[in-house]
Amino acid sequence: MQPEFWHKKWESNQIGFHQLEVNPYLQRHWPDLAIPVQARVLVPLCGKSLDLLWLAGRGHQVLGVELSEKAVEDFFHEQQLQPQVSEQGDFKVYRADAVELWCGDFFSLTMADVAGCTALYDRAAVIALPPAMRERYAAHLQSILPACRGLLVTLDYDQSQMPGPPFSVDDAEVQRLLGSVWRVEMLEQQDVLGDSWKFVQAGVTRLEERVYRIRGV
């Protein structure tokens, strides 16, 4: 999967993965993580998610990473924020209040870039990536952020019934990808097929969302 794939998705507004409301799993489970109010939270592959504002509204400093400059600019425009723009290594950084969006390749992110981040929120990052890239993503994420707490949201369905993205990432893969460095605990599992017409149309017969708590070992 090449960067152009995502650039075209954003340019053509094919962004069915974007949620028009704050994610309910985030609202339900984040408070139980006991993450300090002023903690810095890393949000990989963040798009223009409203979850960024929700996290900032709880007092957190939010560092989102997004490949598409259109997504980043749309976020600030739609939220009526005027960001300051600067360069940081390979990234173009947009800052407004407690939100920083780093526009560039997630795999270029370094440990120094995320210094101070003690929390992680992944709703649509790992499931956006095909298998080989998921391996790279998990390894890179754990190398730059070995000690953290946070939430991961995944989808699980029969991948043979529909091509991704979003891709299916089952519980065994979550444990294999992340369990060697972090403690990974499933908090919730929901059957969401009835709410997902795209999947039904494609012939998917089972669709589950899972929410995991992540803690550095």
From Swiss-Prot:
Binding positions for S-adenosyl-L-methionine per the UniProt entry: W10, L45, E66, R123
Source species, domain of life: Bacteria
GO biological process per UniProt: methylation; response to metal ion
Reactions performed catalytically: S-adenosyl-L-methionine + a thiopurine = S-adenosyl-L-homocysteine + a thiopurine S-methylether
Coiled coil: none
Major localization listed first in the record, in broad terms: cytoplasm
PROSITE patterns, per database record: SAM_MT_TPMT
UniProt keyword terms in alphabetical order: Cytoplasm, Methyltransferase, S-adenosyl-L-methionine, Transferase
Entry keyword Ribonucleoprotein: no
Compartment(s) of residence: Cytoplasm
Top EC group: transferase
Protein EC: 2.1.1.67
GO cellular component, one term: cytoplasm
Keyword Metal-binding found: no
Molecular-function annotations in GO: thiopurine S-methyltransferase activity
Membership in a protein family: Belongs to the class I-like SAM-binding methyltransferase superfamily. TPMT family.
HAMAP family hit by this protein: Thiopur_methtran
PANTHER family listed in its UniProt record: THIOPURINE S-METHYLTRANSFERASE
Name the record gives this protein: Thiopurine S-methyltransferase
Species name: Pseudomonas fluorescens (strain Pf0-1)
